[in-house]
Amino acid sequence: YPLRRQRQMCIRDRNIYRGCSYSCVFCDARSTCHRMDHEFEDIEVKAHAVDMLEYALKKKRTRSMIQIGSSSEPYIPLEEELQLVRRCLNQIERFDFGLVLHTHSMLALRDIDILDKINRKTKCIVIVRLSTYDDSLAKKLEPGTSLPSERFSLMQQLTERGITVIVNLAPILPFINDDMENIQGLLSYCVKAGVYGILTDKMCPVLREGNRERFYQQLYKNFPDIYDQYEAVYADEKTLKTKNYTEIMACIRETCEAHGIQYDKAVSYTHLTLPTKRIV
């Protein structure tokens, strides 16, 4: 029920850009199921995104949450120049809608003034993805993206404004970032930043057509020492579930309960909604 309700009360996700200039070792957006008909690095810009959003919001008869960036990172380097995301945020604030923003980029701080306005009028939630607390490891896993220490700063500055932050803990890759030191480091960031919740439903990467081949290529390139381990343990497995998954989940649950952080997926996703309110 909570998930069904959440879908009903959110406008269809707005992905202003399709594709990405980053080169993360694992990237689900590269899967063929997302039906991208061009090279992933050849970024598709939805030039009329602002006008289309304005038109959609004018027609809506009930307030709801609008999601930006659940499939593609909205704050790619190109956004610094085009500012399409910022202009879309202005429309959301103008029409008094709520916002769910997915990002792992420090560029989001550029728009903290608008995020703050949206949050004061309705609700603003920022979902930040984290996979490691180690900056040096992140440079290999997610080259070009904002470092974990920078994302921690982003989370802190958002929560200081009263903006809700939820951490998407993903991906946790076997033999790479599934050690308990890394998990505890990630949880420490969450506790210190005062996040509302932690999502773990995408923690275990799923290899699909389109991203599987590239994942193993990147694995061999960046982590050649463990390539054979993957071949031996996972072979043709679709889901890369770490062997210490149970221990990781127990650690997350214990930490969240001790610090009042939500770890129940249904509770966090339900929080992404707004009470139904008809526009007069």
Predicted segments with their positions:
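Conserved Radical SAM active-site core
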Residues: 5-8, 12-127, 135-139, 148, ...
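Non-cysteine beta-strand/loop elements that form the S-adenosyl-L-methionine
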Residues: 121-134, 198-203, 224
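Conserved strand-turn element in the central/C-terminal portion of the radical SAM core barrel
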Residues: 133-135, 142-144, 158-179, 203-205
